[in-house]
């Protein structure tokens, strides 16, 4: 049985660890609220762009943008969104497992893959497996910078427009609620005909022949022309989806970290209680032994 001093040292060590995890839990909770606000703030923008683009495409059915054209899949691009830091439960493990399964599937089908990584964890994974890494961006901080994101993703978008790849996928973690985050592997390009938002469940469909949910329907005059506006809107829509993927992942990261640190703090509290019980028993045994020795010595005299 360990001595009293050793047990006291262990208790002190676990108490110090609990202070750290408790502080990290509080920081993650604060960052989580801000990350959720940023995530939700981007949704109205994407919805309005989607509505306008759908209205334009319905009015100009003869126009076909490259982002909407289905091709035979011979090569694809994959954008893997992970965190820069750990201590967030199984968040990175789950999305990595899904991504590796898809990469294996592409390999079995003879489809070439070129990858882009956001976050240190994803970069490390793709480097270890020897993936064809064409761009990456790390140390994104707590607030995603759209310019930095677009700088890394431009390689993939240019490859799609030039025909080097026939589809673009994004692997990220969708934020469901504070306690639940789910890994998703979604096709970004070519866009679905209805311009559905892949990061919103139950998103309304704005496809050819579908209803645009609105209280009015006006025939707008677009400058310089409708096709130019469609080109610009679709580009912005794709950029918005990528930003949303990173924002969702950041909200998921802080939620997962808060939950993980709370679990660590609760476990530390339990360990402290168990050690305190062992300490009390050991101390009681030592006192009892000392009293017995004193009584035995007195009896001998």
UniProtKB/Swiss-Prot annotation:
It is found in: Cell inner membrane. Keywords: ATP synthesis, Cell inner membrane, Cell membrane, CF(1), Hydrogen ion transport, Ion transport, Membrane, Transport. It is a peripheral membrane protein. The keyword Magnesium does not apply. GO terms for molecular function: ATP binding; proton-transporting ATP synthase activity, rotational mechanism. It comes from the Bacteria. Gene3D superfamilies: 3.40.1380.10, ATP synthase, gamma subunit, helix hairpin domain (1.10.287.80). One of its GO terms (cellular component) is proton-transporting ATP synthase complex. Its main location: membrane. GO terms for biological process: proton motive force-driven plasma membrane ATP synthesis. PANTHER family: ATP SYNTHASE GAMMA CHAIN (PTHR11693), ATP SYNTHASE SUBUNIT GAMMA, MITOCHONDRIAL (PTHR11693:SF22). HAMAP family: ATP_synth_gamma_bact (MF_00815). F-type ATPases have 2 components, CF(1) - the catalytic core - and CF(0) - the membrane proton channel. CF(1) has five subunits: alpha(3), beta(3), gamma(1), delta(1), epsilon(1). CF(0) has three main subunits: a, b and c. Belongs to the ATPase gamma chain family. Produces ATP from ADP in the presence of a proton gradient across the membrane. The gamma chain is believed to be important in regulating ATPase activity and the flow of protons through the CF(0) complex. This is ATP synthase gamma chain. It comes from Bordetella petrii (strain ATCC BAA-461 / DSM 12804 / CCUG 43448). The gene is atpG.
């Amino acid at each position: 049985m360990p001595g009293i001093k050793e047990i006291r040292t262990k208790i002190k060590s676990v108490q110090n660890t609990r202070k750290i995890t408790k502080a990290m839990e509080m920081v993650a909770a604060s960052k989580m609220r801000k990350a959720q606000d940023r995530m939700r703030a981007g949704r109205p923008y994407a919805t309005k762009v989607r509505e306008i683009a759908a209205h334009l495409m319905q009015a100009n059915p003869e126009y076909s943008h490259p982002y909407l054209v289905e091709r035979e899949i011979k090569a694809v691009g994959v954008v893997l969104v992970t965190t820069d830091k750990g201590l967030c439960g199984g968040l990175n493990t789950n999305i990595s497992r899904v991504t590796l399964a898809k990469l294996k599937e592409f390999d079995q089908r003879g489809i070439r893959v070129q990858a882009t990584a956001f976050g240190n964890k994803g970069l490390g994974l793709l480097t270890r497996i020897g993936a064809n890494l064409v761009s990456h961006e790390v140390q994104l901080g707590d607030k995603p910078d759209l310019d930095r994101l677009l700088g890394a993703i431009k390689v993939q978008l240019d490859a799609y427009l030039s025909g080097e790849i026939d589809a673009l996928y994004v692997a990220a973690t969708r934020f469901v609620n504070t306690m639940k985050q789910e890994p998703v592997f979604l096709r970004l390009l070519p866009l679905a005909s209805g311009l559905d938002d892949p990061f919103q469940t139950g998103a309304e469909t704005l496809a050819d022949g579908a209803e645009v949910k609105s209280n009015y329907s006006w025939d707008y005059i677009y400058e310089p022309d409708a096709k130019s506006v469609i080109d610009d809107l679709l580009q912005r829509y794709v950029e918005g989806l990528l930003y949303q993927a990173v924002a969702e992942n950041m909200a998921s990261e802080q939620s997962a970290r808060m939950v993980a640190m709370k679990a660590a703090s609760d476990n530390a509290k339990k360990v402290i209680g168990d050690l305190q019980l062992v300490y009390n028993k050991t101390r009681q045994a030592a006192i009892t032994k000392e009293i017995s020795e004193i009584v035995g010595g007195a009896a001998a005299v």
